[in-house]
Regions:
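Bacterial N-terminal signal peptides that target proteins for export
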Residues: 2-10
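Bacterial N-terminal signal peptides
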Residues: 13-21
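Sec-dependent signal peptide cleavage junction
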Residues: 20-34
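Extracytoplasmic
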Residues: 33-37, 64, 81-83, 90-94, ...
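N-terminal lobe/hinge region of extracytoplasmic solute-binding protein
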Residues: 41-90, 121, 133
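Solvent-exposed loop/turn segments at secondary-structure junctions
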Residues: 45-48, 76, 102-104, 153-156
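Aromatic- and charge-enriched surface segment that lines or borders ligand/interaction sites
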Residues: 84-126, 147
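Surface-exposed binding/hinge segments that line
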Residues: 98, 131-170
């Protein structure tokens, strides 16, 4: 009987030791004076940051590496992000997004409506998923506004542009 108690205590002790040995503490090391690099620890990540190549763009936006014109808040409502506001025509074929001023890309370049237009056009050229969201005829810049001209009405255009496929890249 004493032999069984010793075995149980030994087994429990080994189980605890194995459990605690599997936990580790990790700490990023780097030059505290460096302002050019950030280290992020993640459990998984896409093998590319290109939003049109794989459907891992949600990861990119989740880690705050890229942003869209609109986004969903914690209640699932569409709210402004890189666009300050938006409006649409009565027929639902023309959508105007006012592009936020004072935004910089990670390389320090200012984000302009022309750059946003080029980013959306790039996405439309590279991804065959764009028609699943909207039927784009053309894009036009008017001051701080980016105007989407659609071939068919789309009542959810602001929601479509919250999808990370439409991350604004420079």
């Amino acid at each position: 009987m004493r032999n069984n108690v010793v075995k149980k205590v030994l087994a429990a002790t080994l189980a605890c030791m194995m459990t605690f040995s599997m936990t580790t503490v990790a700490q990023a090391k780097g030059d505290k004076n460096s302002d050019k690099e950030i280290t992020i620890g993640v459990t998984s990540f896409a093998d590319t940051l290109e939003p049109t190549e794989q459907y891992f763009s949600w990861v990119v936006s989740r880690y705050a590496i890229g942003e869209c014109l609109t986004k969903f808040d914690e209640h699932g409502e569409i709210v402004p992000c890189l666009a300050e506001e938006w409006d649409n025509s009565e027929d639902g074929k023309t959508w105007t997004f006012k592009i936020r001023e004072g935004v910089k890309f990670s390389n320090g370049d200012d984000m302009t409506p022309e750059m946003v237009k080029a980013s959306i056009e790039r996405t439309a050229e590279k991804s065959d998923r764009v028609p699943e969201f909207f039927d784009l005829d053309s894009l036009e810049v008017d001051g701080q506004n980016l105007i989407f001209h659609l071939n068919r009405a789309n009542a959810n255009m602001a929601g479509c542009l919250a999808d990370p496929l439409f991350l604004i890249v420079d």
